Amino acid sequence: MIPVVIEQTSRGERSYDIYSRLLKDRIIMLTGPVEDNMANSVIAQLLFLDAQDNTKDIYLYVNTPGGSVSAGLAIVDTMNFIKADVQTIVMGMAASMGTVIASSGAKGKRFMLPNAEYMIHQPMGGTGGGTQQTDMAIAAEHLLKTRHRLEKILAQNAGKTIKQIHKDAERDYWMSAEETLAYGFIDEIMENNELA
């Protein structure tokens, strides 16, 4: 169930679902697994807010375990495509594809709440049952290219070498807010709507 907010206007009461009300304040919620429908919703909101006023920042709140690489990269590409700066605020967790999205916020405007977590790892893939050997080889090559592309983005976002990201992402690499700040994926830790 989505909560409804009622506001008083000059024309009387107006009700909004909570997400529409947040959108009025240029806030987008990216929560749950990254998949095509969620990505399309986030992208549409980014494009709408940029068209409305590209001089004002957009606030993207992130709490995701990750998910689809293609859906996540579509969000990242849109964040880079629009003129408005996108501030990212990690709450809960940004894991896997979520780290790529959250770390792609505007430089100097990437934030994290004090008890949130970050996790990087190598991308996962599969070919399903009954796959021919040549298709498996193609899938493996694509997975390696995808890994390199993601490592390149993460390295740029954190100011690290691709070699360092590759090493750290070999297995699940969890970081606290303080560790994420030291690593370079965020710019500040936020407490009580203020910077720590």
UniProtKB/Swiss-Prot annotation:
Keywords: Cytoplasm, Hydrolase, Protease, Serine protease. Gene3D superfamilies: 2-enoyl-CoA Hydratase, Chain A, domain 1. It catalyses: Hydrolysis of proteins to small peptides in the presence of ATP and magnesium. alpha-casein is the usual test substrate. In the absence of ATP, only oligopeptides shorter than five residues are hydrolyzed (such as succinyl-Leu-Tyr-|-NHMec, and Leu-Tyr-Leu-|-Tyr-Trp, in which cleavage of the -Tyr-|-Leu- and -Tyr-|-Trp bonds also occurs). It comes from the Bacteria. InterPro entries: ClpP, ClpP/crotonase-like_dom_sf, ClpP/TepA, ClpP_His_AS, ClpP_Ser_AS. Signal peptide: none annotated. The active site is at S96, H121. The keyword Cytoplasm applies. GO terms for molecular function: ATP-dependent peptidase activity; ATPase binding; serine-type endopeptidase activity. One of its GO terms (biological process) is protein quality control for misfolded or incompletely synthesized proteins. Its main location: cytoplasm. It is found in: Cytoplasm. Its EC number is 3.4.21.92. PROSITE patterns: CLP_PROTEASE_HIS, CLP_PROTEASE_SER. GO terms for cellular component: cytoplasm; endopeptidase Clp complex. It is an enzyme of class 3 (hydrolase). Cleaves peptides in various proteins in a process that requires ATP hydrolysis. Has a chymotrypsin-like activity. Plays a major role in the degradation of misfolded proteins. Fourteen ClpP subunits assemble into 2 heptameric rings which stack back to back to give a disk-like structure with a central cavity, resembling the structure of eukaryotic proteasomes. NCBIfam families: PRK00277.1, PRK12553.1. Belongs to the peptidase S14 family. This is ATP-dependent Clp protease proteolytic subunit.
